[in-house]
């Protein structure tokens, strides 16, 4: 389920994915942190017989010809190289592989940024009828409240004129959290991050032996 809520009035609408269970085998919304997804993928790859999995490797350059390609990576032990027939670059919006292939990333980046604060505070014990996914409307500022195992995540829009030092300051984080729910006690903050949102697409998805 997920809800649209008014900060003052409570739940305005609730959507139950269970109502479409006869239409799909997956009547739910999945929220999975990147580090957990990486662990799941690592375990799955091992079950598929993949033995060489490397962490803390940053691709720095690549060379390719008609026979294959070589990727060079910076590692804690220095530069290493890996050779093969094909390369798939699945390294996100700031893809090094895409940049090394000079593939344009056309579109734009939204000016608005989004601050995410994670806390073990149990909002469900304080806010009545709270879902695990909640979009809050308010005349002053909207926000998003999301439950993941062990934590609640609160997402706020951030003004363009706010600098990162101010955004991540302990006082500003606490001020935002108390605005969502005034507890009178400091929140235990587990994690904070600032996101940019891109509306972009790669100009093309293949460069000889490299795929995005």
Task: State where each predicted segment sits.
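Active-site-adjacent segment of FAD-dependent monooxygenases/related oxidoreductases
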Residues: 1-46, 63, 137, 146
């Amino acid at each position: 389920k997920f809800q649209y809520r008014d900060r003052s009035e409570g739940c305005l609408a609730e959507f139950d994915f269970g109502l479409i269970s006869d239409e799909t085998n997956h009547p739910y919304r999945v929220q999975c942190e990147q580090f957990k997804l990486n662990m799941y993928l690592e375990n799955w790859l091992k079950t598929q017989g993949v033995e060489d999995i490397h962490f803390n490797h940053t691709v720095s350059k690549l060379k390719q010809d008609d026979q294959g390609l070589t990727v060079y990576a910076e590692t804690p032990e220095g530069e290493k190289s890996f050779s093969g027939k094909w390369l798939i670059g699945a390294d996100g919006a700031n893809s090094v592989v895409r940049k090394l292939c000079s593939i344009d990333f056309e579109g734009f980046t939204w000016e608005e940024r989004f601050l995410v604060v994670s806390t073990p505070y149990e909002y469900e014990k304080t806010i009545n009828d709270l879902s695990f996914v909640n979009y809050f409307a308010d005349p002053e500022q909207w926000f998003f409240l999301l439950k993941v195992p062990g934590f609640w995540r609160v997402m706020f829009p951030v003004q363009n004129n706010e600098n990162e030092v101010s955004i991540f300051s302990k006082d500003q984080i606490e001020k935002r959290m108390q605005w969502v729910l005034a507890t009178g006690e400091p929140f235990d903050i587990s994690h904070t991050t600032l996101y940019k949102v891109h509306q972009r697409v790669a100009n093309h998805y293949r460069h000889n032996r490299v795929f995005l």
